[in-house]
Amino acid sequence: HEAIETTKQRVQIRFNLDSAESEEVITADHLILALGAGAINSEDFNSLSLRPVRGQVEAIPTQPPIDGLNTVLCHKGYMTPALEGRHALGSTYVKNDLTTEVRNEETETNLATHEQALANTSIVQALQHDGKARAATRLGSPDHQPVVGALHNFDVIKSQFAMLSVGKPLTSAPLLPNSVVSTLTCLGSRGLTTAPLMAEVLVSSLCKEPLPLSNDLLNAVNTSRFMTREMIRSQS
């Protein structure tokens, strides 16, 4: 990004404070970009093929028999136990949509999904909607896995993994230069469960501590995986 200047050891971030004309500069050892769906507006993520995904969740009032629900019901959608008299019922999945207004058609989609999945239960009659809902945008990746780790320029990846683009195996593991910019993103629909572990992966890597995942799992969330896959697909 144009507001970020990096050297081999340090990073400078320039930004304007709200309603202020003066520019403030922060210098740090490392910058972690955790921008959610806002990452699509940053050129630092251009090579990662990420996309925003809109989701709408209904907040339906509780009543018998769902007032006794004490676990999350999961199928193609989900419904949670009541909190303050309401159940969360969701969620829609609309790719490349950054809008957050509540839509009646998505309410109907959510209700229909649950009515179909729970058709033979007494719960169906309790799925009464009174217009309360919210929508937000999460960030998704092509393989639906989180994206965690250092952000490298595509030209750097291309030079280090050049053998892949001509269909030849790598004779040794490429050594990428240290990056002072990393990301923790694409937590998708299940971020509450993946965020703590992914944060531990990133912090352990930065602090050179033992990593909490196997190599296979680390490769599955590595920031460079989309670029290397593209190089393999483009073999000449």
Protein language model regions, located:
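A conserved short coil-to-beta-strand element within the FAD-binding core of flavoproteins
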Residues: 1-12
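Conserved active-site beta-strand-loop modules that form the wall/rim of enzyme catalytic pockets
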Residues: 9-11, 29-31, 40, 76-80, ...
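Short beta-strand micro-motifs in enzyme catalytic cores
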Residues: 9-11, 54-58, 144-146
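Short beta-strand segments that buttress and anchor functional surface loops
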Residues: 12-18, 183-186
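Central helical "cap/lid" subdomain
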Residues: 15-74, 103-107, 120-126, 213
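Short glycine-/acidic-enriched loop or helix-start segments at secondary-structure transitions
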Residues: 42-45, 98-100, 158, 193
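Active-site lid/adjacent beta-loop-alpha segment flanking the redox-cofactor pocket in flavoenzymes
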Residues: 65-177
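C-terminal catalytic lobe of FAD-dependent flavoproteins
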Residues: 126-236
